[in-house]
């Protein structure tokens, strides 16, 4: 692991995680290149900011559940290769039912570079501290559809309010949202703004 990075659970006591790209449960339908263990890595700076977000969330009765953090460049390349393959319908219904696989790049859901590779971007949601249940957000992680946009129409008032709650928690902790994905937040003062790393999550 590069200097300045760590497993986020080492600093964020009580955080939950489910590193989707290390599993078969993601839009490619298999573990993604570069993810060798089901843990999440980030910069020390993002860990400190997330610790602040944890405090804000806990005051409202919520905990943080992380889906992705640092993403190796090899994983981004794996996504691009997958997006260029003919449709096999293995994951389409769950992740991108309303657009074609070939459109995922042009619509901004799959990119040739990812801020995740700089180590200070996080994909996450909230869960209820008292029950452990995930907070309803109106769409699932990596659902590549307008329902996942911050300005989505067709989600309930409660789900829209929950998204605003997550956004307020994260923005008050130094993060910037991404309009196409309610779960995606980038640390504004990231320590490596021009470096795209490629060490494995191991």
Curated annotation (Swiss-Prot):
SUPFAM superfamilies: Hedgehog/DD-peptidase. It catalyses: D-alanyl-D-alanine + H2O = 2 D-alanine. Binds 1 zinc ion per subunit. Zn(2+) binds at residues 116, 123, 184. Keywords: Antibiotic resistance, Cell wall biogenesis/degradation, Dipeptidase, Hydrolase, Metal-binding, Metalloprotease, Protease, Zinc. The record marks 71 as: Transition state stabilizer. InterPro entries: A_A_dipeptidase (IPR000755), Hedgehog_sig/DD-Pept_Zn-bd_sf (IPR009045). Its cofactor is Zn(2+). It is an enzyme of class 3 (hydrolase). The active site is at 181 (proton donor/acceptor). One of its GO terms (biological process) is response to antibiotic. Pfam families: Peptidase_M15. GO terms for molecular function: D-Ala-D-Ala dipeptidase activity; metallopeptidase activity; zinc ion binding. Induction: By vancomycin, mediated by VanS/VanR. The keyword tRNA-binding does not apply. The keyword Calcium does not apply. NCBIfam families: dipept_VanX. Catalyzes hydrolysis of the D-alanyl-D-alanine dipeptide. Belongs to the peptidase M15D family. This is D-alanyl-D-alanine dipeptidase. It comes from Enterococcus faecalis (strain ATCC 700802 / V583). The gene is vanXB.
């Amino acid at each position: 692991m590069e200097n300045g990075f760590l497993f986020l659970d080492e600093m964020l006591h009580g955080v939950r995680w489910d590193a989707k790209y290390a599993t078969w449960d993601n839009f490619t339908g298999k573990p993604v290149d570069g993810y060798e263990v089901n843990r999440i890595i980030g910069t020390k700076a993002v860990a400190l900011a997330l610790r602040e977000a944890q405090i804000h969330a806990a005051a409202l009765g919520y905990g943080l559940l992380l889906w992705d953090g640092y993403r190796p460049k090899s994983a981004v390349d794996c996504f691009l290769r997958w997006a260029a393959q003919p449709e096999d319908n293995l994951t389409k219904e769950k992740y991108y039912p309303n657009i074609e696989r070939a459109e995922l790049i042009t619509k901004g859901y799959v990119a040739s570079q990812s801020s995740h590779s700089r180590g200070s971007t996080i994909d996450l949601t909230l869960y209820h501290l008292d029950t452990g249940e995930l907070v309803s957000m109106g769409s699932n992680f990596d659902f590549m559809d307008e329902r996942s946009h911050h300005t989505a129409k067709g989600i309930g008032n409660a789900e829209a309010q929950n998204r605003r709650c997550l956004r307020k928690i994260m923005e008050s902790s130094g993060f910037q949202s991404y309009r196409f994905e309610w779960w995606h937040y980038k640390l504004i003062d990231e320590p490596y703004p021009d470096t795209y790393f490629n060490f494995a999550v191991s």
